[in-house]
């Protein structure tokens, strides 16, 4: 199974949930029906763990992100950056089998691929503050 690809799918699903306010099961069903993403080697157990973990711990995760923002508020972040930060923060806080540096690096890679030009440095700064604390 490919964790990077699974993280990317989880990010797409969480982003979609933040926009459409639909249940995860409905978003997942629509995603599988309409995606052009190759779903081979995607770990749906891992995706479920991330999505459900973030949904169950969103308040704590968002608090942790906000504590590590410099001169920013959570509500000013783009939805994609917030989604990426939530995934990596969840991994840092709750998934001991993932080294913090891996969670940070994966977040930077997602930001490079899906967000604005300045987002990788921003994501790195927020998460860097978090793992130093």
From Swiss-Prot:
Pfam families from the UniProt entry = NusB
Q: What is this protein called?
A: Transcription antitermination protein NusB
Q: Which organism is it from?
A: Clostridium novyi (strain NT)
Instruction: Give the record's keywords alphabetically.
Output: RNA-binding, Transcription, Transcription antitermination, Transcription regulation
- What's any GO biological process attached to this entry? DNA-templated transcription termination
Q: Where is the signal peptide?
A: none
Tell me what gene encodes this. nusB
Say yes or no: keyword Transcription present.
yes
In terms of superkingdom, the source organism counts as Bacteria
InterPro entries, per database record? NusB-like_sf, NusB_fam, NusB_RsmB_TIM44
């Amino acid at each position: 199974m490919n964790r990077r690809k699974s993280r990317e799918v989880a990010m797409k699903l969480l982003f979609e949930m933040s926009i459409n306010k639909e249940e995860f099961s409905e978003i997942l069903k629509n995603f599988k029906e309409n995606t052009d993403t190759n779903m081979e080697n995607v770990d749906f157990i891992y995706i479920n763990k991330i999505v459900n973990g973030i949904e169950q711990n969103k308040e704590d995760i968002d608090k942790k992100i906000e504590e590590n923002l410099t001169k920013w508020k959570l509500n000013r972040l783009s939805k994609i950056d917030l989604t990426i930060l939530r995934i990596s923060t969840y991994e840092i806080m709750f998934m001991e089998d993932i080294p913090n540096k891996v969670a940070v690096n994966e977040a930077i890679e997602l930001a490079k691929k899906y967000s604005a030009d300045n987002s990788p440095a921003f994501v790195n700064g927020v998460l860097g503050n978090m793992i130093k604390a």
